[in-house]
Amino acid sequence: MNTCSLSRLAAGVIALAIVFSASAAPGQGPVLPLPADDQQLIGAHLGTGVVGAARPCEPIVDASRYFPLQERDFTFQVTSGSHTGNSQTVSLKKARRPGGAVAWRFGFAPTLAGFITTTSGGDLLMTAVSDVHEGVIVFTTPANPFVLASIKPGESRSFKQKVSVNYLDDPTRRDWGGRLNATYTYVGSYEITVPAGTFDTILIRFAYRGKVGPADVVYTAWYFFAKDIGLVAMVNLEDVSAFWIYHVDTTIGKVLAVR
């Protein structure tokens, strides 16, 4: 092998070493491109220019960093759905329970709220969702995952749920129940630009399908969480084949308008 060939070989080895050391640098997790199907649906409901480049991502160690349980208001701009163009201000509130326990309620919309609890392992779970406009509360067993601690980038967790729909005017009355097949996925980390600013976020996709009474239910949600901020963008797509059971207008996109 001549001197020129040795030089080229040495240069190639050095280049590979640089690339490898960069990808293995401390604190640098995998970079997971946004899947094409997700990109298309998210873009259609959040608008162009909101989702930027994929970023290095890491396992979720402390779920509360991505959704801090502190009382505050969030102002979102609605980007798709029947209220497109409107602003909505919702709240994260806590309530005391016997024995000193704390319960949390987060408003996804002015009339739609999720009830959040923390497990001993640090997971944030949503135990129920209420819609005061329709006068119903929906329970799922096990509870819906919101932010899970220790889940890894690209990991999916699938599980089965029981669901019941109860009426606020008569909580003991349960006309409809059913079963769902759900999948919770840590899709990756992406730069997000919204009116409130530009953030590095993690993207969680939560999807389920099944039957509630005679209705076929298909639901997918995408949640973008920024550390120490919480939700900065979300898309909810719901398809219920029998709206006369109950109807929640959750086919919407929203972006954080005020930090």
Label each residue range with its predicted role.
Residues 2-13:
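Bacterial N-terminal signal peptides that target proteins for export
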Residues 11-21:
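Bacterial N-terminal signal peptides
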Residues 18, 45-48, 160-162:
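Short hydrophobic/aromatic-rich motifs at helix boundaries and adjacent loops
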